Amino acid sequence: MSASPVYPLEGGCACGYVRYRITSPPLFVHCCHCRWCQRESGASFALNALIEADRVVHLAAEPQLIDTPSNSGKGQKIARCPKCQVAVWSNYAGAGPILRFVRVGTLDHSDSLPPDIHIYTASKQPWVVIAPDVPAVPEYYQSDRFWPPESLARRKAFWPSVEAYRAAQRS
């Protein structure tokens, strides 16, 4: 695992049709153990790097956005390769298209981004062992409590766009 990844990082789907680049470090990396992520990923958890959409650059074909239910009941749009159907990121209803949850496993060097936090550990598989030095919470969490100051400053900068998106969704 890289102690300090060099940006940009690139990734894509299994067949190579969809390729992307993340231009900066993510805000935070979640290892989500909720049953929804387990089902959607077909694995014991989903590892997602939260990053502003404008820091994710398309290098090849556009992914197809698929409306999918989520644990919150508000849904998500999963970006999948239209050929091999691999999910490369999600946009959840709360922040819409402004914030992406990039699937870390789709990065060319997926070991570059270990989890900053384990979430929904109340539903994790009992045989999954969480490193004692990584925060773990039974459900979701307050970002103000766990995110580094740089990430909180970035969130403050894009939050007006999230509010505008939410207002447009209500009208």
Indicate where each model-derived feature is located:
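A short Gly-Trp-Pro
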Residues: 1-10, 17-171
